Amino acid sequence: MKNEIKYLYSDLDGTIVSWNPKTEFVYQNKSYKNFHEVSDATISAFYRLQQKGIKVGIVTGRDYCRVLWLEKQLRTGLPTITLDGAIIFYQNEILSQTYLDDRFIEGINNIVKRFPEAAYKLNSGWISYFTKNPSVIFEIDYAFLGYFNPNTKLQKKFIDSTENWDLNKLKVNQVYFDIDTCPLAMQKEIIELISVSDVNAKIYEHSMYIIKNGVSKASALQSLNQFAIPITKDNTIVCGDGDNDIEMMQWAKHSVSLIGSNPKCFALAKYHTDSVDNDGIANWIEKNLLC
């Protein structure tokens, strides 16, 4: 197996980044959990893989503001796939991006005008458009933008929920709602709009995010061939734990999941390892790719 592998792509949260980090960082006099915390064992394993000639990349549902610093820490050499495949970044440029249809964004615009208290963001390339409404989720985004990315192309801008958006200028890769700020009537309208639109939505306890239908981590990995990166399902191993990793587990010949993962993701993976808090991925790499 190890002689086949030329590329390794790993998810972040729950895979190599713990949901319970041990460290914090301080931004504007407030402490935040450091979801950039990666163990020394993982950093070492990734570095030694690359020394061996196996290239390493990140594939995540995160916004790039929560990834860019990790690229440097892990010294990745492949394009970074963000927003579950909606944007691919490489060498400080956008390599590829997929937009939601203008008609869908117009529908979202009409809904938020009726519920101006809701907190959400529109991800658009290097720019994240936020409302000014209070949100625990987006407050953390502000902190990550300000603390880890002060001198990058990443930008934070604010959008007015009461205005008609200029869809000739506003091209959106992802819509992300803080569900805790959205009235039930609003949530119902959003779900109804989703049901008649060409979109893919992930709905969790506190959040909902929406990207173009057909876009996934797997589709993004497959698209890298058009950029002269000869990734195939046979020469790539993927690591993941969540429901948004299922399609890439189905695509790749070689896949690793961890104890504590989404049950379907875990069942689909070819190989299994210990939990993220016990350095599962690093240990698996040591035993199977660096031996």
Curated annotation (Swiss-Prot):
Q: Which InterPro entries match?
A: Cof, HAD-like_sf, HAD-SF_hydro_IIB, HAD_sf
**Superkingdom of the organism of origin:** Bacteria
**Keywords carried by this UniProt record:** Hydrolase, Magnesium, Metal-binding
Carries keyword Hydrolase?
A: yes
Q: Which GO terms describe its cellular component?
A: cytosol
Query: Which Gene Ontology molecular function entries are recorded, alphabetically?
Result: magnesium ion binding; phosphatase activity
Q: Which cofactor does it need?
A: Mg(2+)
The record's annotation in PROSITE patterns points to: COF_1, COF_2
As recorded in UniProt, its EC number(s) are: 3.1.3.-
> What are the catalytic residues?
11 (nucleophile)
What family is this protein classified in?
Belongs to the HAD-like hydrolase superfamily. Cof family.
Recorded hits in PANTHER family, A to Z, give: HAD SUPERFAMILY HYDROLASE-LIKE, TYPE 3 (PTHR10000:SF8), PHOSPHOSERINE PHOSPHATASE (PTHR10000)
**This chain belongs to which protein, by name?**
Putative phosphatase MG263
Source species: Mycoplasma genitalium (strain ATCC 33530 / DSM 19775 / NCTC 10195 / G37)
